[in-house]
Amino acid sequence: MSVGIIGAGQLAYALARGFTAAGIVSAHKIIASSPEMNLPTVSALRKMGVNLTRSNKETVKHSDVLFLAVKPHIIPFILDEIGADVQARHIVVSCAAGVTISSVEKKLMAFQPAPKVIRCMTNTPVVVREGATVYAMGTHALVEDGQLLEQLMSSVGFCTEVEEDLIDAVTGLSGSGPAYAFMALDALADGGVKMGLPRRLAVRLGAQALLGAAKMLLDSEQHPCQLKDNVCSPGGATIHALHFLESGGFRSLLINAVEASCIRTRELQSMADQEKISPAALKKTLLDRVKLESPTVSTLTPSSPGKLLTRSLALGGKKD
């Protein structure tokens, strides 16, 4: 099995790093494409031994499972570009927020009658094999296609199948969730520094507290509120701290954050369905389209980071 990733940003790096760390796909069986070859993530992928190219078509050609790991506004252009190269063997996995299965299928069905499409929402902790992933099956995707994707994503964290109409809510919760956690951790560390702790120690203690709390919850059958109560001694420091959080609307802020992310995802979906994008996204789309339509299709191989080659990548004929 070979894996292609269109896009070479943070998600692409996280997926490649997770898959190789899990041993489910070797680096030489992964190919990623990007119009920009000077990105930090591209350098990191190159160091891992991942095959790199500027050509999205080449990525399709040398993959069985194809991840679309680009921003939602660029998906239509990507599909127009690669549609003729997608074959019956390909499983096309869209990771773009708000991009529906039907919109991807509609584009690809201009080139073939039954494209196998799966919509996926994951998050960046797949890089340390602690990701949270859900997926929904497209009209023509087979049971074994879903099983293959679940095998891949389960190797880098939690993975389960859901109905597509739940994915927007998942985006608001676990898709955006790591950012909430990082912001909370940064604030906790600031609190520690305010009280006299060195920054490095404050960050480490805060991160360990969040990690330990998450593991306690996942390893038990207790409700989060019960675990919270277990930390609170009558009249103690923790219950006073929780009272302060409650008075500041801590719970409501988190609930509203999940809702805001979900609503924005639905707005992106509506804009995509109507083929409308924001002015800022339009400007970026035009720039990206120029890069996509560039005649240069040279390949950067991991073994020669400074040398451009025009030959095809040899990813091996045998399937894992």
From Swiss-Prot:
GO terms for biological process: cellular response to oxidative stress; L-proline biosynthetic process; proline biosynthetic process. Homodecamer; composed of 5 homodimers. Interacts with LTO1. The keyword Hydrolase does not apply. This is Pyrroline-5-carboxylate reductase 2. The keyword Isomerase does not apply. L-proline binds at E164, A237, T238. Oxidoreductase that catalyzes the last step in proline biosynthesis, which corresponds to the reduction of pyrroline-5-carboxylate to L-proline using NAD(P)H. At physiologic concentrations, has higher specific activity in the presence of NADH. Involved in cellular response to oxidative stress. In some cell types, such as erythrocytes, its primary function may be the generation of NADP(+). It catalyses: L-proline + NADP(+) = (S)-1-pyrroline-5-carboxylate + NADPH + 2 H(+); L-proline + NAD(+) = (S)-1-pyrroline-5-carboxylate + NADH + 2 H(+). GO terms for cellular component: mitochondrion. Residues 295-320 are annotated as: Disordered. It is an enzyme of class 1 (oxidoreductase). The modification Phosphoserine is found at S304. Gene3D superfamilies: NAD(P)-binding Rossmann-like Domain (3.40.50.720), ProC C-terminal domain-like (1.10.3730.10). Keywords: Acetylation, Amino-acid biosynthesis, Cytoplasm, Mitochondrion, NADP, Oxidoreductase, Phosphoprotein, Proline biosynthesis. One of its GO terms (molecular function) is pyrroline-5-carboxylate reductase activity. Belongs to the pyrroline-5-carboxylate reductase family. Residues 295-305 have a biased composition (Low complexity). The modification N-acetylserine is found at S2. Pathway: Amino-acid biosynthesis; L-proline biosynthesis; L-proline from L-glutamate 5-semialdehyde: step 1/1. It is found in: Cytoplasm; Mitochondrion. Its EC number is 1.5.1.2. NADP(+) binds at residues 6-11, 34, 56, 69-72, 95-97.
